[in-house]
Swiss-Prot record:
It is an enzyme of class 2 (transferase). Catalyzes the condensation of carbamoyl phosphate and aspartate to form carbamoyl aspartate and inorganic phosphate, the committed step in the de novo pyrimidine nucleotide biosynthesis pathway. Carbamoyl phosphate binds at residues 68-69, 118, 148, 151, 277-278. This is Aspartate carbamoyltransferase catalytic subunit. HAMAP family: Asp_carb_tr. PROSITE patterns: CARBAMOYLTRANSFERASE. GO terms for cellular component: cytosol. Keywords: Pyrimidine biosynthesis, Transferase. Its EC number is 2.1.3.2. The keyword Lipid metabolism does not apply. InterPro entries: Asp/Orn_carbamoyltranf_P-bd (IPR006132), Asp/Orn_carbamoylTrfase (IPR006130), Asp/Orn_carbamoylTrfase_sf (IPR036901), Asp_carbamoyltransf (IPR002082), Asp_carbamoyltransf_Asp/Orn-bd (IPR006131). The lineage of its organism: Bacteria, Pseudomonadati, Pseudomonadota, Betaproteobacteria, Burkholderiales. Belongs to the aspartate/ornithine carbamoyltransferase superfamily. ATCase family. It comes from the Bacteria.
């Protein structure tokens, strides 16, 4: 998706919406990660709040189901002292045929300050960002196959937390890359942050043809893909988005690309294992790996709150 200018930034180059990790500079990505680092300690305080968004209204608009993302956004906004409104899409006027922009216009009339949007159509958050008032901000919580920038950012935070520096890292992204908005967000962020090597690993039917053009190495066997890797990011099979016979079966996929403790030994001894969730144990990853010492899957969730606090506080502090 190409744009004449980056709609995420104002004329001063400041972040006013978070729509994608693509097109964001290393300086902006680092600003978000550094700000998140300052928020991590909030979760361990007796009073888990800071007043940065006091008096602001944050509307969570999830047109697709979500547990972790919606909950962590709600927690993040609450810890910033915002008023949080969760729209019940199934019972809203949108379910009765109201257009997306009419829904946004009506909610804007209720003095919304920030929209967190998850939508099945790629580009929906961009459309909203182009039609809101200058003081209103949009954060993409996942749009179609296109992008999931806050997941990408929390993945970057997790990697930086455990590995410190990106410049010598080999990161392998394994699984259903074709349907994964997380993979795209991770790739854009990793390359911008100077990761030494990014590998995309999966069967040919689940790896987009344009991956090599994104500056990554494509591997069609798990063994090649994770050998010597510092970071392994596992992705589930998104059966709900698949059309046609892309795989013989999930069992065959698991046999070839499922991460087991034995296969994990091909990676570096201090490699970390990540997963954006939801996890399908026994398919893309064995329980022994999920619950093992190299797994940082639960810390990812914890860091996600701080990262989303950082994103909302930064965009809300800048004017279009």
């Amino acid at each position: 998706m190409l744009y004449r200018r980056n709609p995420q930034l104002n004329k001063n180059g400041e972040l006013i919406h978070l729509l994608s990790t693509e097109g964001l500079s290393k300086a902006i990505l680092t600003q978000i990660l550094d700000t998140a680092a300052n928020f991590v300690s909030v979760s361990s305080r007796e009073v888990k709040k800071v007043p940065l968004l006091r008096g602001k209204s944050v509307f969570n608009l999830f047109f697709e189901n979500s547990t972790r993302t919606r909950t962590t956004f709600e927690i993040a906004a609450t810890r910033l002292s915002a008023d949080v409104i969760n729209l019940d899409i199934a019972r809203s006027s949108a379910s009765k045929g109201e257009s997306l922009l009419d829904t946004i216009a009506n909610l804007s009339a209720m003095a919304a300050d920030l929209f967190v949007v998850r939508h099945g159509e790629s580009g929906a958050p961009y459309l909203i960002a182009q039609h809101v008032a200058p003081h209103v901000h949009v954060v993409n919580a996942g749009d179609g196959r296109h992008a999931h920038p806050t997941q990408g950012l929390l993945d970057m935070y997790t990697i930086r937390h455990y590995k410190k520096d990106f410049s010598n890292l080999t990161v392998a992204i394994v699984g259903d890359v074709l349907h994964s908005r997380v993979a795209r967000s991770d790739i854009h962020a990793l390359t911008t942050l100077g990761c030494a090597e990014v590998r995309v690993v999966g069967p040919k039917t689940l790896v987009p043809a344009d991956m090599a053009q994104m500056g990554v190495r494509v591997c069609n066997t798990l063994e090649e893909g994770i050998r010597g890797a510092d970071v392994i990011i596992m992705l589930r099979l998104q059966n709900e988005r698949m059309t046609g016979a892309l795989l013989p079966s999930s069992q065959e996929f698991s046999k070839s690309f499922g991460l087991t403790t034995d296969k994990l030994q091909l990676a570096r001894p201090d490699a970390i294992v990540m997963h954006p969730g939801p996890i399908n144990r026994g398919v893309e990853i064995d329980s022994a790996v999920v619950d093992g010492v190299q797994s940082v899957i639960l810390p990812q969730v914890t860091f996600g709150i701080a990262v989303r606090m950082a994103v909302m506080s930064i965009v809300a502090g800048n004017e279009a």
